[in-house]
Amino acid sequence: MEHHCSALGGKQMLREEIKQILPHREPMLLLDSVWKVGEEAHGTYQVRGDEFFLQGHFPGQPLVPGVIHCEILAQSACVLLSDGLKEGQLPLYAGLDKVRFRHPVRPGDTIETCCRIKRAKHPFYFAEGRALVNGKVCVSGEFSFAVTGG
């Protein structure tokens, strides 16, 4: 996956605005802020250390599980789908491909995402993205969604 994220611009949306777009709620709302910049979505999530997914993963050395990295990317990408969804429609994960975990994420880290929709053939959407901490890529991959309902 070779794409570069553009510099931030556009309007920042915080959690309450994100809740108007995504159906996720705590503890599964995993974006603190997001920007739509052209064809890209840029998101952030601050790992506080008290999240449910850190309990037992791993005692004394907590790390954010890889599946949570993927969920954060998915939520960021789904912000891009929001304009085209009708009432009651829900994008669901259809697949993950070429996912690579490159750097661990720990409590106190701020995850920054960059995602874009590569291709769309309704009801399927194909995206790619990456998440970084302090400029280091933690995860990258391609993922797809199927829009259901409505």
Regions found by a protein language model. Name each.
Residues 3-12:
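Short, Lys/Arg-enriched N-terminal segments with co-localized hydrophobic residues
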Residues 28-30, 111, 125:
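Hydrophobic core residues within well-ordered beta-strands of beta-rich domains
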Residues 76-112, 142-146:
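Hydrophobic beta-strand-centered segment that forms part of the acyl-chain substrate-binding groove
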Residues 38-39, 105-109, 116-150:
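HotDog/MaoC-like acyl-thioester-processing domains
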Residues 34, 64-87:
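Active-site helix/loop of acyl-thioester processing domains in fatty-acid/polyketide metabolism
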Residues 26-64:
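Catalytic strand-loop segment that frames the active site of acyl-thioester-processing enzymes
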Residues 13-25, 86:
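Short aromatic-glycine motifs in intrinsically disordered, low-complexity regions
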Residues 32-33, 98, 128, 142:
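Extracellular/lumenal ectodomain signal focusing on beta-strand-rich modules
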